[in-house]
Regions:
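C-terminal catalytic histidine-bearing segment of alpha/beta-hydrolase fold enzymes
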Residues: 242, 249-309
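Acidic catalytic loop of the alpha/beta-hydrolase fold
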Residues: 231-235, 265-266
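Short beta-strand/loop motif that positions the catalytic acidic residue
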Residues: 220, 226-228, 232
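Alpha/beta-hydrolase fold nucleophile elbow
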Residues: 146-158
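Membrane-embedded segments
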Residues: 63, 67-141, 145
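Hydrolase active-site cap/lid region
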Residues: 163-216, 222, 270
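An N-terminal hydrophobic leader/cap segment in hydrolases
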Residues: 21-61
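Short alpha-helix in the alpha/beta-hydrolase fold that links the catalytic acid
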Residues: 99, 222, 236-246
């Protein structure tokens, strides 16, 4: 097929999609995308697990009367970091329990939630906006349970990584020590580009749930650890390269990217020493960096700096 014909066909397909979207209507298009992106599974799966032993189960009430279901596991170590875990698409807390258990086995305190539409949370079709609201409510609970910001960490896997980045980018968010993003993507538009028909013009204009992490990362200054398996067949691991590159305001020694050789989309957390050494070193260094930032910003140090000048 001549190049001009191929170009015309691409434009024609793009125009057809735009016309179809207009016919279907924005409301239906939005609902379809939300269902496709979050894909919450409501049927019990044989491999789902109960929460780790000693976990508290409770609900967090939202201002509109909805609720999000939460699990909290308290480490026996008094100085352990406390991690807010934001899971990805499809699986609820029971489907993600293996990931939480991997962290609690290493005695990290952990708070995990189901977005609305998942598990025992209020049944509704989730969206980027509602997931963001749920994460904000969960972080408020994290602050209540962990008053020391040096020990607060945000951790998101896959879609949860995008939710975590959005949460961390909020200007009114209470302080935290660091952000951990695992197996996540640059944006929904970026993910469309990896699909068979991702070249079709106009697709990005149809996205109602952008989850655009790149611009948000460009505003962050707190330490960030990106983790990705090189055998991920859901989200290309190169997307973590782009996420890492976007976090330009983070100090170079506190902006880290770890690739887990041979790990799939969900198995990095099970990969052993490479993963857990990266996490342990990061949480230690981010905690120390927070302390130093606060020491440098103290009134006494500021006064000494002015006098020295």
């Amino acid at each position: 097929m001549p190049a001009t014909s191929r170009s015309f066909m691409k434009r024609a397909i793009g125009a057809t999609l735009l016309i179809a979207a207009s016919i279907v209507g924005c409301t239906q298009l939005d609902a379809w995308q939300r269902e496709a992106i979050f894909s919450p599974v409501t049927e019990q799966q044989s491999w789902w697990r109960d929460p780790p032993e000693g976990t508290q189960e409770f609900d967090i009430a939202l201002a509109d009367g909805d609720k999000i279901h939460a699990w909290y596991w308290q480490s026996p170590k008094p100085n352990a970091p406390t991690v807010l875990y934001l899971h990805g698409a499809r699986w609820n807390l029971n489907g993600s329990a293996f990931r939480m258990e991997s962290w609690t086995d290493r005695e990290y305190s952990m708070l995990a939630i189901d977005y609305r539409g998942f598990g025992k949370s209020t049944p509704r079709l989730p969206s980027e906006e509602t997931a963001s609201e749920d994460a904000v409510a969960a972080f408020a609970e994290l602050v209540r349970r962990q008053p020391d910001p040096r020990k607060r960490f945000i951790y998101g896997h896959s879609l949860g990584g995008a939710v975590a980045i959005d949460l961390a980018s909020r200007k009114d968010l209470p302080e935290y020590a660091g952000l951990i993003v695992e197996s996540s993507f640059t944006s929904i538009g970026g993910m469309l580009g990896t699909l068979k028909y991702g070249w079709v013009p106009g697709l990005n204009f149809l996205v109602t749930q952008p989850f655009d992490s790149l611009d948000k990362l460009a505003t962050l200054t707190a330490p960030i650890l990106f983790i990705h398996g090189t055998a991920d067949r859901v989200v290309p691991h190169e997307m973590s390269d782009a996420l890492y590159a976007a976090a330009t305001k983070v100090a170079p020694d506190l902006r880290r990217l770890v690739k887990i050789d041979g790990a799939s989309h969900s198995s990095a957390v099970r990969s052993g020493n490479t993963y857990w050494s990266a996490v342990a070193n990061f949480t230690r260094d981010a905690t120390a960096a927070y302390r130093h930032r606060k020491d440098d910003a103290s009134p006494d140090n500021a006064r000494q700096a002015r006098q020295a000048g």
